[in-house]
UniProtKB/Swiss-Prot annotation:
The protein's name: Neuromedin-B
Subcellular location: Secreted; Cell projection, Neuron projection
Induction: Up-regulated in response to infection with influenza A virus.
One Pfam family recorded for the sequence: Bombesin
Record organism: Homo sapiens
A GO cellular-component term linked to this record: extracellular region
Major subcellular location class: secreted
Gene: NMB
Length: 121
């Protein structure tokens, strides 16, 4: 009887080896993952879009930084005048370097005449 049990065991292991070698029996079990509430959400490619842009631009809750141009909102009137006079001096020096006359005004372009000519065509 011991011989039959040993033969059956050997036959069973040989059969299992043959099945594994043939690729019929999988080497690892693919168990289904546990379902959570998040897996029940359905995604529609063109479905409900009511909240699409709701969070656009809201990346953090930190207070906003000062203005991007570097000018603080509490600039005094004296500082503004100094900045404007500095900018005006730079513009005048640039015009002089380019050879633009400072005494006569810039020529006025007759947009009305040009517009009438275009509309008449």
């Amino acid at each position: 009887m011991a011989r039959r049990a040993g033969g059956a065991r050997m036959f069973g292991s040989l059969l299992l080896f043959a099945l594994l070698a043939a690729g019929v029996a999988p080497l690892s079990w693919d168990l289904p993952e546990p379902r959570s509430r998040a897996s029940k959400i359905r995604v529609h490619s063109r479905g409900n879009l009511w909240a699409t842009g709701h969070f656009m631009g809201k990346k953090s809750l930190e207070p906003s930084s000062p203005s991007p141009l570097g000018t603080a909102p509490h600039t005094s009137l004296r500082d503004q005048r100094l900045q404007l006079s500095h900018d005006l001096l730079g513009i005048l020096l640039l015009k002089k370097a380019l050879g633009v006359s400072l005494s006569r005004p810039a020529p006025q372009i007759q947009y009305r005449r040009l517009l009438v000519q275009i509309l008449q065509k």
